[in-house]
Each structure stands twice: as C-alpha cells, then as structure tokens.
C-alpha cells in the first residue's frame, strides 16, 4: 500500500476516482466509483466489476462518529411455558439432541405434576447436547426478575454407571449425571458465549419423581448482557446418552 492516497471528483459524471489503483473494500478491478447519493449521514457509491462480468458492487460509508452500535434495551419480561398448547410461547432451540418427539406425555402424572404434556429432553452421545431460548430485541433486566423455575423428572432407567468417551483430558466426569444445569449467556458472543456465562447446577437429584427446582441468579442481578437461557441435563463433555423430562418452565421474580 502507498503511504497516502488522493481522489479526484468529477461533478459532471458524479464519480469519485482513487489514486494509485486504490479501491474500496472488495477488489472489482476499478478505482472509479459512481456517487449514488450523499447526505450528512451517509455516502453511497457503486461500481461495475471489471473482473467479475455482470457483477456490480455497492458501498455505504458513514461518518466515524456515527458508526456506533445501537443501544439494546434492558427489559424485565416474564417467560413461561407448560407445553400444553400446540403453539409454544417459549420454543427451545435444540442442539445435538435426539430424534424422539420432544413434546411428550407425562411419564408420571402424579403430584407435584399432574399435567398432560411435558418436555422430553433426549441427550445424545454428542458432548454438548443442550436446549436454549434467546429473546430478541432486548437483554434481560435481572434486577428483580432473576429466577428460573421448573419441574424435573430424572428416570432411573438411564445408564448412570458405565464410563463413556469425553471431549478431552480436561473433562473429569465421564458418566451420565442425575443433574440439570441452567445457564445465562450473551448470544452476541456466538460460539464463545460460554466464556462469560453464569451457570447454576442442581446435582445428585432424586430419581423417578417430579421435583420442583429454582435457579436463583440474583448474584448477577447487575449484569446487562444476558439474553439467552440454556438448559442442560446429564452433564456435559461426555458421550453418555440419557432421557429426562421437565415441565412448567418459568423465568420470573
């Protein structure tokens, strides 16, 4: 690259030409760009590619001081799902889960959960099976609304004794666990959202009966970056499969 570049403006043709064969962004074999529009907020340019026949490129430039990320509001919005209706209000995303129908008949319709339908969670041999729900357009206001509650059922027929493969030497647990974890994450971080997560694990849960659990995230009530709830049964990092059930999910005060 050159130490510096200049440009020439043709007001009649409404074009802008860069010096020294310079180009904006994607190389299109030209240094001349047509000015489509110019305002105080944005400059729009275009060019016909000379190296990709039939292609045309558009460019948008805005003042540096205006190139800021939009502010994402923080809201206290309650979430609840009992899985009884055909259209779910909280429809969990399934990651590396099994193929069994996830809305399932209650395996034990007795107190404390006599409802007709529940959620069947089928952990596969994948190391990081999980389900998650991400809200759109806002982040969680955890000031008061910081409790996740659900009813869970841990079947005894799962194989909790055998040793299974793990994701690596750093994984110390290689058996299926009678547990459930709930995590709050920042979805903006994508595949690295676990790096800033807050996780609560309920371990060594009693089997073959419905249990009412509460996950209290009041310790991170000042966080403003979370917008994703992850639920994970049986532990992670190992290939042990298992089936679990939960119902009456809520995120509230």
PLM regions with names:
Residues 1-6, 10-76, 225:
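Lipid interaction determinants
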Residues 55-56, 60-253:
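Beta-rich carbohydrate-recognition modules and glycan-binding surfaces
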């Amino acid at each position: 690259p050159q130490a510096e570049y200049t440009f020439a403006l043709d007001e009649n043709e409404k074009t802008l030409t860069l010096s020294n064969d310079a180009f904006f962004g994607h190389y299109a074999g030209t240094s001349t760009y047509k000015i489509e529009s110019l305002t105080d907020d944005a400059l729009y340019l275009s060019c016909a590619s000379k190296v990709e026949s039939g292609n045309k490129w558009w460019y948008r430039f805005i003042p540096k001081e205006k190139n800021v990320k939009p502010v994402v509001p923080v809201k206290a919005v309650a979430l609840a799902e009992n899985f009884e209706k055909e259209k779910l209000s909280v429809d969990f995303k399934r990651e590396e889960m099994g193929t069994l129908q996830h809305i399932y008949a209650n395996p034990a319709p007795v107190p404390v959960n006599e409802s007709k339908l529940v959620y069947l969670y089928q952990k596969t041999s994948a190391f990081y099976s999980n389900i998650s729900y991400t809200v759109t357009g806002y982040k969680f206001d955890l000031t008061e609304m910081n409790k996740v509650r659900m009813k869970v059922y841990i079947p005894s027929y799962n194989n909790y004794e055998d040793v299974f493969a793990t994701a690596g030497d750093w994984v110390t647990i290689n058996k299926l666990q009678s547990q459930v974890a709930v995590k709050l994450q920042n979805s903006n971080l994508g595949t690295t959202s676990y790096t800033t997560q807050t996780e609560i694990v309920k371990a060594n849960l009693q089997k073959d009966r419905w249990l009412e659990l509460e996950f209290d995230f009041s310790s991170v009530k000042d966080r403003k970056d979370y917008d994703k709830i992850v639920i994970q049964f049986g532990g992670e990092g190992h290939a042990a499969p298992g089936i679990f059930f939960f119902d009456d999910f809520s995120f509230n005060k």
